[in-house]
UniProtKB/Swiss-Prot annotation:
GTP binds at residues 16-22, 44-46, 307, 333-335, 415-417. SUPFAM superfamilies: P-loop containing nucleoside triphosphate hydrolases. Pathway: Purine metabolism; AMP biosynthesis via de novo pathway; AMP from IMP: step 1/2. It comes from Mycoplasma mycoides subsp. mycoides SC (strain CCUG 32753 / NCTC 10114 / PG1). The active site is at residues 17, 45. This is Adenylosuccinate synthetase. Belongs to the adenylosuccinate synthetase family. Homodimer. Mg(2+) binds at residues 17, 44.
Amino acid sequence: MKNNYKSLVIVGSQWGDEGKGKITDYFSQKADVVVRFAGGDNAGHMIEFNNKRHKVTIIPSGVFNPKVKNIIGNGTVINLKSLVNEIKRLNESNISTDNVFVSDRAHLIFDWHALIDQLQEENRKENKIGTTKRGIGPTYADKAARYGIRICDFQNPNFKEILKENLDYHNQIITKVYNHEPLDFDVIYNESMTNYQFIKNNIIDSGYEVSNLINENKFVLFEGAQGVLLDIDHGTYPFVTSSNCSANNASIGTGIHNKQINKVLGIVKAYNTRVGSGAMVSEIKTELAHKLRERGREYGLNTGRPRRIGWLDLVALKYAIRVGGIDQLFLTLFDVLDTETKIKICTHYKLDGKIIDWFPASDYELKRCEPVYEELDGWNQDITKVTSFEELPINAQKYIKRIEEIVKVPFLGFSVGSDRKQTILIKGEFDD
């Protein structure tokens, strides 16, 4: 596996859960650095190798390679309690976290953020977003409103007063808007200081560090969270996450300039899934959805919620490619379709009787869209042991080629199982 450039951004091209962690782990075997640039511990990544499965939520997926420096960038939001627990859990599995570093500019998730997240979701009644209730949205809201507290604020001699003022403000919302009991300051302060002491020696200026490494010709992987269709600006609003998930945010969420980004790889599942509310044009409403869900183990890593299942939506994928800046694609969970004799791909939408090939902005419009399908022959045989594109059944090869023809972007590779070894490059190297 050759690498002809200094940096690669890996993003999800659907509604998350595409297998970004597995592909990041695969490429991290040749990387010097892996950076998480957005999201929080709401994004669970599952990595499998040597017959063991490992889950990470906020720590970059490169942590399983001891030679890789792993950086949690300034664009993330960090729950220190979750981070410390994740570090301890990895250490208990004999995985070193000495190579994990945290940006001093990252914003912090506190107990009040998670509580407000929960109370807001309950207040929405039938219009729920489907949030994980981990405080991600309220933390990003505080960041924009300039109420946020960053990791570097721990060094301020007035940190205790800053924290108290912040909690007092949020307790007003908790008690007067939601009629809930206030949170206790001493508990939050003591816990925060304990967790800060645990990670303080691993706090860095992520932008300074990553920029220097790129200038030294080190290979840097940028690991995205969620997917482009959950992007706060370009996703299916309001049923989105609270951060920017596209490659455009990799530089902002790390602290470098966008000219230091070379390539963008979009991870695309062989079918569509979605957690929570919001339109999903190609959703399967038959028993087939349950069958594919079980074959693909399509349940949330953090919440256990069953994911909604749909045929691959190429209208949405073309949109994600455009706004996500995607140069190449990587197909995952390809083997889940092994048992299907007929496979559909959504090539267009029908909106109010008109055929369209563009992705509507509003959930109201998307819910009125009907899928226009093209049906392909399946391969109906096990592909989990193939080691090259040429070993795939002809119809599986045709599936990949047909997607490429429609979206006009090539596949770099595909995955036929959960193990690291079941990851196959089509061309054997990264394209220039």
